[in-house]
Amino acid sequence: MPSPFPRRRCLPGDFSPSVDSRPCSSPCELPGPTGKLFLGGTPPRALRLPRRLAWCSIDWEQVCLLQRLGAGGFGSVYKATYHGVPVAIKQVSRCTKNRLASQRSFWAELNIARLRHANIVRVVAASTRTPAAFDSLGSIIMEFGGNVTLHQVIYGATGCPEEDGPPCSAGEQLNLEKCLKYSLDVVSGLLFLHSQGIVHLDLKPANILISEQDVCKISDFGCSERLEDLRFRPRHHLGGTYTHRAPELLKGEPVTPKADIYSFAITLWQMTTRQVPYSGERQHVLYAVVAYNLRPSLSAAVFTESVPGKKLEDIIQCGWTAPAQQRPSAQLLLLDLRALQAELG
């Protein structure tokens, strides 16, 4: 069976930007002082890469793992340093129930490999050749965007179930000014992505990091797509979180940037209400979203107590309207949010 991934997207796994070009054995673990884990050695047939290609290989001698930040269906994320700089390392697990989906997730993360924007988590380096200790399909070193996600800010340090589950305690109070600041960060990131022909397709609070400078950065591009790629092949599998998935995607219609606008509207609603979007069984929610235009309630006091609150409600409603073509673009959404921010002074 031919590989589902085009050859042009294969990383040069036999290369590493090492200071020398000596061949060596498989990478090994070297315990460092203070209990940190250093990864020594370089892959076989290692050669020095030109600087312009340094992003598509990892110098494992410069990696120091600090702690595991979390784990998901496709692997684990670690806090680490790379060349002495704080980073996050995502390891795509080899032992998953759906290996093909794991491979797709790895390559999707690299859709943003050469992009730079203040509100997008930057890819520093990536490789399909990893130390044996990881037992992974591939590794991606990313900018360390922060220890906190927007999900944790909204729902508290312990987080909150994204699907059905017990009630959660809210996090810190997010006033309208803070909601708008974070919204402008996120939409600025979306505008840049869409201008590059990329759709995220899994935008939600858990995938938005907040840096020490209080800047939101969009992360986790494992479901992302390049629009130009979709012209040549259908998208058979739609990942992402069902509570934030646009109704046209649930119906199998074409992917457009407007799907991210829908997800943002749900996210903005979460910021302003600090509630979970839906309760009830997943299949019932999916059916109601498509067949009956089910949306989260807009009855919260924040939408009725002031003129700015009412305008925020209008922005949310426009963002999650069912006909995708009627939703605003990221550019128009950014203008509306800036106007509302100016109104608040």
Swiss-Prot record:
Subcellular location: Cytoplasm
Pfam families listed in its UniProt record: Pkinase (PF00069)
EC nos: 2.7.11.1
Domain Protein kinase: 63-344
Residue ranges of the TM segments: none
Top enzyme class: transferase
Residues holding ATP: L69, G70, A71, G72, G73, F74, G75, S76, V77, K90
Protein name: Proto-oncogene serine/threonine-protein kinase mos
Assembly description: Interacts with MAP2K1/MEK1.
Organism: Sus scrofa
